[in-house]
Structure formats: C-alpha cells, structure tokens
Amino acid sequence: MANFKVVVSDPKEARAYQIDIKDAEANALIGKSIGDVVDGSIFGLAGYKVQITGGCDGSGFVMKPDLPGPRRQRILTATGVGYVPKLPGQRRRKMMRGKEIAPDIVQVNAKVVEYGSKSIKALLGLETAEEAPAAE
C-alpha cells in the first residue's frame, strides 16, 4: 500500500503543515498530476480544496511538471525544477520523475487554493487552548 507525506502550504498564514496519509487516502492520490486540484478531505481538511504542486520519490528525485507519466527519466535540462546551471547556457542530463503520482512517491507538496469554514490548525488538532476562540 502507498504511504505519503503530504506537505500542505497555506499561503494566507505563510505556514506549511506535514500530514501522513496511508492506504485509502493515499490511493485517492495515485494517478493525479501536478496542477490537479483535489478535495482536502483526503488529508483531513474538510471543506478545503488543495492543488498538487510537486513532490519527490524515495531516492530524492523531484517531480517535473512538464514531464509526462509517472516514471523516472534522464533528461537534458538547462533550467527549471531540479537543476540550477553554474554557467550561462550550461546544460546537464539529470534524472527526474514525471508529473503523475505513483505508489513509489514519498512526499507530495500541495497548496491551499480554496478555504473551508474552520482553520487548518483546528482541523489537524494543532490548536492549543489559549489559541482557540472562547465559546460562550
């Protein structure tokens, strides 16, 4: 079964939250691509919409948004994700993953694009008693 560490970034709060998902929730992500918008309830964020922005596999190879399919490929690259040239015009052949999520992906990066009624901290159980609004 697939297990993923999902890093969900919240642009409003400028914070990131790491969530471990397993089995049925993880299987819902398999086959999705970078740029797809998924329901946040997969990650325990009911009411939220989340966009997949990237990830990497167990060997540390990054997912490239313009590389089709789920497999690893050695591609000739000049700039972009996973490579910064040392000299202008320098190119290099690098191993990268395609944009589709497969079972051997370890980390999935995502960002919130549509917010729900509750805060992310409250949904994940990270809100402490003094941070929570008093219910009177």
Swiss-Prot record:
Q: Does the keyword Ribosomal protein apply?
A: yes
Q: List the disulfide bonds.
A: none
A Pfam match? Ribosomal_S6e
Q: Cellular component per GO?
A: ribonucleoprotein complex; ribosome
Q: Could you give a GO molecular-function term held by this entry?
A: structural constituent of ribosome
Identify the InterPro entries for this entry: Ribosomal_eS6, Ribosomal_eS6_arc, Ribosomal_eS6_CS
- The UniProt record lists the keyword Ribonucleoprotein: yes
Q: Which GO terms describe its biological process?
A: translation
Q: Which UniProt keywords apply?
A: Ribonucleoprotein, Ribosomal protein
- Stored HAMAP family: Ribosomal_eS6
Checking NCBIfam families in the record gives:
PRK04290.1-3
Q: Which family does it belong to?
A: Belongs to the eukaryotic ribosomal protein eS6 family.
This protein's name: Small ribosomal subunit protein eS6
The source organism is Methanosarcina mazei (strain ATCC BAA-159 / DSM 3647 / Goe1 / Go1 / JCM 11833 / OCM 88) (Methanosarcina frisia)
